[in-house]
Design a protein with these regions (language model features):
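Formylglycine-dependent sulfatase
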Residues: 1-241
Length: 241
């Protein structure tokens, strides 16, 4: 399952059955990267669909969305839905990258028409605060390139403007995705088998677990994030039981 030292190429190999080094783009991607998996190749979720399974992808995706010029205010195609998943609820990249929104079946959840969302990995949008210009807005110090747009008091990689109501709250992400998994399991066609890909967002940086997990270990935010990840898996297994 781990064909590479990083997650995107490993995930690419998992879904396509191909070594990531056969695709020069199978590497850590920006949040606005185009879909990495070609739509015209066999994939694991497509094979599951062909075998009669209902398929879903929930959680961290980071395999690209769209065609390289994403309009986040419309349905995003191509997407995980076009490479074998019947239902999807995802973050486009990682917790530390923009856009900091949930994308459900190709649509940004909670996005308001009068507050459109814009994303750039090249230049900031005029007047938008960053970790370097407005350090007073942060609850976490920037590090290792995380000094661009501030969301939820946390500095991110990349620049983002708008979509205020759609932006996630990091502390709630574990509960959010667990609830989406339960909703899928509850609402699925019980006459069919199912295949669920659940991409854990923890313990990826910035490691901001819910308050109930803060201090649950003696190993700081990373240890607490691991405990939160364990809780997520336990909740889903218990629900299945």
């Amino acid at each position: 399952y781990a064909t590479s030292a990083t997650s995107t190429p490993s995930r690419y190999a998992l879904f396509t059955g191909m070594y990531p080094w056969r695709n020069a783009d199978a590497k850590i991607l920006p949040g606005d990267a185009p879909l990495l998996i070609p739509e015209d190749i066999p994939t694991m979720p497509k094979m599951m669909q062909d075998a009669g399974y209902e398929t879903a992808a929930i959680g961290k995706w980071h395999l690209g969305m769209g065609d390289g010029n994403v309009d986040w205010n419309k349905e995003i195609v191509p997407s995980a839905n076009t490479v074998g998943f019947d239902y999807t609820c995802l973050i486009a990249a990682t917790n530390d990258r923009v856009p900091t929104v949930y994308v459900e079946n190709g649509l940004v959840e909670g996005l308001e028409e009068d507050d459109p969302l814009y994303v750039s990995y090249e230049v900031n949008f005029e007047g938008e605060p960053t970790a370097l210009t407005h350090p007073e807005m942060m609850k976490m110090k920037w590090y290792d390139g995380h000094f661009n747009t501030i969301v939820n008091g946390i500095p991110r990689i990349g620049f983002m403007k708008g979509g205020q109501k759609a932006r996630w709250v990091d502390e709630d992400m574990a509960d959010y995705f667990v609830s989406k998994v339960k909703n899928f399991l509850q609402g699925r066609d019980k006459s069919r088998p199912f295949f669920l890909y659940y991409g854990l967002h923890q313990p990826h940086v910035p490691r901001v677990p819910h308050q109930r997990f803060v201090g649950s270990t003696s190993m700081g935010p990373r240890g607490d994030a691991v405990v939160e990840a364990d809780w997520c898996v336990g909740e889903i297994i218990s629900y299945l039981d």
